[in-house]
Design a protein with these regions (language model features):
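A detector of single, family-specific signature residues
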Residues: 1-400
């Protein structure tokens, strides 16, 4: 017998169905809660099916973000084999029936049927370090997106309170710039202070700079206050919003700095991190994201599978005598990996980047390929290089 248990996972609970072999469901469907008692119930079901069928059952369920984490972690701890199905494949299987019926019980039933139709590979447990790195890099991306949104809102408020402040410091979001703005949020507060006092405040915020630099910034700040179209905002709510956004910006910057330190410390212990960084143009953050999203390279037995995992494989459409000649990439893989590879290619095509990749890009352009097509071709080529480098555990050798 080849037993399988299909689980339709939802938030905090799952609906299950047991098959002892193809076409032979066993018993009625069951419910389990994602609690200690519920997982113990699942273990009892697994052991009873194993005793009945004479073989350990495989558990199959759809990838549901973080909802399936309690189930997958429990199965790994108790060394049960499970298959994590791509949601797209599961969705296509659910649509195979002519009847428009959708229930959790039926979904679990169809997952069992899908197990016998397709040849799935058991899910391979990833190393803890790579999982930690993946979570850290994803958290970094999430906070970066929040920081970008906050900057946009901060800009809108600054335009209504102190628009001329933008040109005072080279980087509006540097710590010294943000702290000075928090102390002097309006043109009125700047003009109420002397230029010497401003210079001393700026110098205290940035002790690594010279007093001459602080005096120059104080002069620019005073000039900006004089040029500002209004001394103080008409609405006090704008001033409160500005103070709030300043605090949020500083908090996000602090969180990102802490995450970057943890990512660097964790990545330095991984051999793959140094191997990918040997490719000219790829820095620490991009290298960490790439290896975190790829995971163990042994999961892929061919570079084309890695290309498909990144979603940069071409989509193909052919019907009858028609075959499409303009094919877009599938975009069905890891979007974070795809974005990191895109940035890696752009960096590698610079003067200080990879000469081999630049030569490959130039060749594609000479063939008449548009810029974006050349970039995707370079992404595909870069993935093949990464696959070989990680398999052989060798650094990248560029053209002389």
């Amino acid at each position: 017998m080849n037993p399988v248990i299909g689980l339709d996972i939802a938030k905090g609970e799952s609906k299950g169905q047991v098959f002892l072999q193809k076409g032979k469901p066993h018993g009625k469907s069951f419910d389990i809660q994602h609690t200690k008692e519920g997982l113990s119930q699942l273990q009892e079901i697994l052991l009873s099916v194993e005793e009945m069928a004479g073989a350990s059952p495989t558990v199959i369920f759809e990838s549901t973000g973080h909802y399936h984490t309690p189930i997958s972690q429990f199965l790994e701890e108790h060394q049960f084999v499970y298959i994590l199905v791509n949601p797209l494949i599961a969705h296509q299987a659910k649509k195979s029936s002519l009847r428009k019926v959708k229930t959790d019980t039926l979904d679990a039933y169809r997952l069992c049927e899908l197990f016998y139709k397709e040849e799935f590979e058991p899910h391979k447990q990833r190393g803890l370090k790579l999982l930690e790195l993946r979570n850290l890099t994803r958290q970094h991306d999430a906070i970066t997106n929040l920081l970008i949104q906050t900057k946009l809102q901060f800009h809108a408020i600054l335009d209504q309170v102190f628009p001329e402040f933008r040109g005072v410091f080279g980087d509006l979001y540097s710590k010294v710039s943000i702290h000075v703005l928090s102390e002097f949020p309006t043109a009125e507060s700047v003009l109420a202070s002397s230029e010497t006092d401003l210079a001393n405040r700026i110098a205290a915020r940035c002790p690594s700079r010279s007093t001459r630099w602080a005096a120059d910034k104080a002069n620019k700040l005073m000039a900006a206050a004089e040029r500002n179209p209004f001394r103080a905002p008409r609405l006090q709510s704008h001033l409160l919003s500005l103070e709030m956004y300043i605090k949020i910006l500083l908090q996000y910057q602090e969180h990102l700095s802490a995450l970057e330190k943890q990512i660097d410390a964790l990545a330095m212990d991984l051999e793959e991190y140094l191997i990918i960084q040997s490719i000219p143009g790829i820095g620490g953050k991009i290298a960490a994201t790439i290896i975190a999203e790829i995971g163990e390279i042994d999961r892929f037995n061919h570079p084309k599978k890695l290309v498909a995992f990144a979603g940069v494989d071409p989509s193909v459409f052919s019907s009858g005598k028609f075959t499409a000649t303009i094919n877009r990439i599938s975009k069905r893989g890891s979007s974070r990996l795809r974005h990191s590879l895109y940035l890696a290619v752009l960096c590698s095509l610079r003067k200080s980047g990879s000469k081999r990749l630049k030569a490959f890009y130039d060749r594609k352009r000479q063939e008449g390929k548009p810029h974006k097509v050349g970039i995707i071709a370079c992404t595909n080529k870069l993935l093949h290089w990464i696959y070989v480098l990680l398999q052989r555990k060798e650094p990248f050798l560029d053209m002389a």
